[in-house]
Amino acid sequence: MKPENKLPVLDLISAEMKTVVNTLQPDLPSWPATGTIAEQRQYYTLERRFWNAGAPEMATRAYMVPTKYGQVETRLFCPQPDSPATLFYLHGGGFILGNLDTHDRIMRLLASYSQCTVIGIDYPLSPEARFPQAIEEIVAACCYFHQQAEDYQINMSRIGFAGDSAGAMLALASALWLRDKQIDCGKIAGVLLWYGLYGLRDSVTRRLLGGVWDGLTQQDLQMYEEAYLSNDADRESPYYCLFNNDLTREVPPCFIAGAEFDPLLDDSRLLYQTLAAHQQPCEFKLYPGTLHAFLHYSRMMKTADEALRDGAQFFTAQL
């Protein structure tokens, strides 16, 4: 697709989305487009500080959890002593960026709105860790907390997975991994998926959308994939291309959120249509006027706050 054939996205987004796009952080250095991944990670963490400010206060605990690869950091957000369930949150960032700090506000709001314990898992990033290591560490953390639930005073009888972007893929992939391998980590009550990628390699939205404003050009998407996967065969794995998994049975209830001007939107639409066609419990909601990653911007965007409330409400309705 020639760039000039793409939609004029920045002219079409909502007023509050435009406010976010035009928000300047004077103390922030320029994006290191040609820098190392380490420099890009550092910039991403700095840039997200502004958007994470003002989040709800609540009891927070940090634990290192053992896996076969080593220790993985986790952070527990506890809005009340007697939580009805536990939600595991997987951050976005194209598999190569992000951490528990970059998504702190999202996790706090999700905990506040659901009144469930939220556990953020700082899964290993790529390219240092290749598929399926992140999923294996996520599953290991879930199993650890299930086994140690009494010691950590958390309710693991009912759990859920949630994530944005690449984290949404990891959330659903982890739920399917537990199902397929018959691993008991508590009943999976629901999966919350904000603007994820689930296995499409081409689509209408991937052609019409994506640019420097969201870091999701076709070249960007290819770069993230090459960093994450170990080899070409992994592209067809049912835990990367989730459409190659069995979506006709025992899929936990899924809340699927799409951003109107996100090149990954067709992934969400296809996931919803596939699940619905096979009578798997699911809900799809499109958020008009939004770009990919809008969930970060709840300081300025009512739509971002609404999307988090919607996900929390969906999850608690399954309990």
Curated annotation (Swiss-Prot):
Q: Which InterPro entries match?
A: AB_hydrolase_3 (IPR013094), AB_hydrolase_fold (IPR029058), Acetyl_esterase (IPR023508), GDXG_lipolytic_enzyme (IPR050300), Lipase_GDXG_HIS_AS (IPR002168), Lipase_GDXG_put_SER_AS (IPR033140)
Q: Where along the chain is the active site annotated? A: 165, 262, 292
Q: Does the keyword Cytoplasm apply?
A: yes
Q: Cite a single Pfam family from the UniProt record.
A: Abhydrolase_3
Q: Which UniProt keywords apply?
A: Cytoplasm, Hydrolase, Serine esterase
Enzyme Commission numbers on file = 3.1.1.-
- Any single Gene Ontology cellular-component annotation: cytoplasm
Compartments it resides in? Cytoplasm
Q: Which domain of life is it from?
A: Bacteria
Q: Which residues cross the membrane?
A: none
**Where does the protein principally reside?**
cytoplasm
Motif, Involved in the stabilization of the negatively charged intermediate by the formation of the oxyanion hole: chain positions = 91-93
Which PANTHER family does the UniProt entry name for this protein? AB HYDROLASE SUPERFAMILY PROTEIN C4A8.06C, ALPHA_BETA HYDROLASE FOLD-3 DOMAIN-CONTAINING PROTEIN-RELATED
The record's function comment reads:
Displays esterase activity towards short chain fatty esters (acyl chain length of up to 8 carbons). Able to hydrolyze triacetylglycerol (triacetin) and tributyrylglycerol (tributyrin), but not trioleylglycerol (triolein) or cholesterol oleate. Negatively regulates MalT activity by antagonizing maltotriose binding. Inhibits MelA galactosidase activity.
HAMAP family (UniProt xref): Acetyl_esterase
Tell me the protein family, please. Belongs to the 'GDXG' lipolytic enzyme family.
- Tell me the subunit arrangement: Homodimer. Interacts with MalT and MelA.
Recorded protein name is Acetyl esterase
- The scientific name of the source species is Escherichia coli (strain 55989 / EAEC)
